[in-house]
Amino acid sequence: MTNKSLFSPFSINNHELKNRFVMAPMTRNFAPDGIPSEYAPEYYAKRAKGGVALILTEGVEVSHPSSSGYPDVPNLTSSESKKMWSQVVKEVHKYNSKIFCQLWHVGGIRKPGIDKNKDVPGYTPSGLVKANKKVAYEMTLEDIQEMVSIYAKDAKICEELGFDGVEIHGAHGYLIDQFFWSDTNIRSDKYGGSLEKRTQFARDIIQACQNVTSKDFSVGIRFSQWKQQDYDAKLALNENELKTFVDCLSESKPDFFHTSMRRFWEPEMNNSSLAALVKGMTDIPVIGVGSVGLDKDFIRL
């Protein structure tokens, strides 16, 4: 891809983007009681005004008591938070940009006492946040089904608020990634074991979100090799495993993949980045991010 290509239009689902610049999600901790601050509409609108074609919001907690792991993270539960998100969307749309809401559950990263739901533990597939480190709650099949339903309900809320789509946060060692990762998923039912089974939770969520929203509403997923618990972690040890992973997720027909790399200049395997590898394995649009810095080339571009 040449620099010129970055400024060419691109489509995700039925959304035509004016260029190929995407603002990646960044946690801001500016949402007391889960309500985006009064400055949130201006914050996101500045990026749209600057020319970014697609904005992915900061992580937004799904509407379950166990979803929170950090202070002052926004949610979708109150009328006040919904009102602010609606204003954010309206401001972004003024500049012919699209905006997707990132739906986030931290999983076992949650520590009891982090918020008003003080006795609610961190939810995980197997009670693990790292190999042999069992410090969290192991989800039952009923818990999993409930969580899938909650993601779907929140996706529907996002569409009603005017968002153009949602990104399911499946990266960085949080809940969905804990299902992906063999170190934290040692289940023996349909949600654990093989790599294919470890993607089942994510596939169920993607399909559930699609089932309750319109065909023009985009549903995609973010994933990574690295975890905040282990920067050297791997979902896939080689290209064959990565292809299996991508193929499994593709069965749910997500509208995009968002590959998160700690260092975009460091090859993932075979001298290629994760984004490049995934792009070569699927026709589904691929977003890539990882430590973009303000070097001279970036400033000139």
Give, region by region, the residue ranges found by the protein language model.
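Flavin-dependent oxidoreductase catalytic cores
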Residues: 1-301
